[in-house]
């Protein structure tokens, strides 16, 4: 026979479960469609997973936007499509040419001498429907003039924009977020912009993101894991707060990446671009014939000894507080490149300054980073130790493998990798 205490315990559990089931059943059923224009229901806040193992520094693949894709907003699914249409019967002219070459000059001797370039009207259509594609939530159309403040006017004029990439939904900003890539066709010259549409399809903003290809920072537009902030590569957008600018006077942004939900790594190089004694933007200039899409820019990056002594990297919170400063120089070929790896088992990011040091950044507390000079790291020799995990860092200037003790990330051994084929 069961004791009275056991009986009371079982009865209490039964009543508790019954109450929970009753509360769950009390939610009203979904209402049928009404004659009012449909709007997107409020989305539940995104919840971070308990095991935070994602690499937030990974590069975005920049795939063109979805022609017809099922997306999740809060707890509901919707169908999103993005279309780009070019109208070759509606030319758009602009001068001066700036970064655009003679391949896009207006076919007239006088216009060519004046540096006039020609593109064509484009329409960018964003359509959101319910999950089965029957009800239209919104349909929004944008055009090239909407992007005139996001990139140089001459580049916007001639661009054939790929369908904007869908980056996700930010609950805090109430926005569907898109990455837009605006470039001179058949060249490596272009800019990026971040477009925000609210749940009714209204434009919340188009934020310029700076260069996207040649001379680009190591940065892609991103939403923080919780959706509370959006990185546009020139600023951080936050709900109910002004944008947090990442730009500095007399400095070039070289990298910006989320490290965790509330913290970023931001790297600058201090100095200024100074043009040489040439005439930029002229379509009559040498090496700018009718086949040139983007003439070579003739400039130098000028920096001073005092600027070269300044800390270049910051661990920056999304509130704008600088948590840590140190010197770090990314790789640079046609664009900046953070030579890096995500050591998931140890919960740390590995950043390599070529030929100098390894910077180990704990994801949970990035301000507690530490630096390990490469010359002082012990060389890896077999056998591999019980808690060591290998992580390769390969870039234009670095080919190294680090064996990190996942229980003590300060214990690192290094191995040089053979040259690439």
Task: Describe each region flagged by the PLM.
Residues 61, 70-118, 173-186, 219-233, ...:
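Short beta-strand elements that form the blades of beta-propeller/WD-repeat-like
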Residues 67, 153-166, 208-222, 249-262, ...:
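Repeated scaffold domains used in trafficking and secretory/extracellular systems
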Residues 8-18:
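Bacterial N-terminal signal peptides
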Residues 127-156, 193-210, 234-250, 275-330, ...:
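Surface-exposed loop/turn elements that mediate protein-protein interactions on large endomembrane-trafficking
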Residues 20-24:
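Bacterial signal peptide processing site
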Residues 1-9:
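Bacterial N-terminal signal peptides that target proteins for export
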Residues 29-56:
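Post-signal peptide N-terminal segment of mature Sec-exported envelope proteins
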Residues 145-226, 231, 362-364:
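A charged, solvent-exposed segment within the mature domains of Sec-exported extracytoplasmic proteins
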């Amino acid at each position: 026979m069961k004791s009275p205490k056991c009986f009371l315990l079982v009865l209490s559990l039964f009543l508790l479960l019954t109450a929970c089931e009753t509360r769950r059943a009390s939610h009203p059923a979904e209402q049928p469609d009404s004659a009012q224009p449909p709007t997107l229901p409020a989305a539940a806040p995104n919840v971070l997973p308990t095991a935070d193992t994602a690499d937030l520094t990974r590069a975005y693949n920049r795939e063109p936007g979805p022609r017809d894709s099922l997306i999740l907003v809060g707890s509901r699914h919707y169908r999103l499509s993005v279309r780009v249409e070019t109208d070759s019967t509606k030319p758009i002219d602009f001068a001066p040419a700036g970064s655009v070459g003679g391949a896009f000059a207006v076919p007239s001797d006088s216009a060519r001498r004046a540096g006039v370039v020609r593109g064509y009207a484009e329409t960018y259509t964003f359509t959101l429907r319910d999950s089965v594609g029957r009800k239209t939530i919104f349909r929004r159309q944008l055009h090239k003039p909407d992007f005139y403040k996001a990139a140089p006017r001459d580049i916007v004029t001639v661009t054939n924009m790929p369908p904007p990439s869908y980056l996700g939904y930010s609950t805090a900003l109430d926005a569907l977020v898109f990455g837009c890539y605006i470039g001179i066709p058949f060249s490596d010259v272009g800019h990026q912009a971040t477009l925000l549409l609210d749940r009714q399809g209204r434009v919340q903003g188009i934020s310029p993101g700076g260069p996207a290809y040649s001379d680009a920072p190591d940065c892609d537009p991103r939403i923080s894991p919780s959706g509370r902030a959006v990185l546009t590569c020139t600023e951080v957008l936050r709900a109910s707060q002004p944008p947090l600018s990442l730009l500095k006077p007399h400095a070039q942004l070289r990298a910006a990446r989320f490290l965790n939900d509330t913290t970023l790594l931001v790297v600058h190089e201090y100095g200024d671009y100074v043009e040489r004694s040439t005439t930029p933007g002229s379509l009559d200039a040498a090496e700018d014939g009718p086949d040139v899409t983007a003439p070579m820019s003739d400039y130098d990056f000028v920096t001073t000894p005092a600027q070269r002594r300044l800390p270049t990297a910051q661990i920056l919170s999304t509130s704008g507080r600088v948590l840590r400063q140190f010197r770090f120089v990314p790789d640079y070929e046609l664009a900046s490149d953070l030579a890096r790896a995500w050591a998931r088992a140890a919960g740390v990011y590995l950043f390599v300054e070529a030929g100098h040091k390894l910077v180990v950044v704990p994801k949970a507390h990035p301000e507690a980073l530490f630096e390990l000079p490469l010359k002082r790291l012990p060389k890896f020799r077999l056998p591999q130790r019980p808690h060591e995990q290998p992580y390769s860092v390969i870039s234009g200037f670095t080919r190294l493998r680090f064996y990190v003790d996942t229980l003590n990330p300060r214990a690192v051994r290094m191995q040089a990798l053979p040259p690439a084929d």
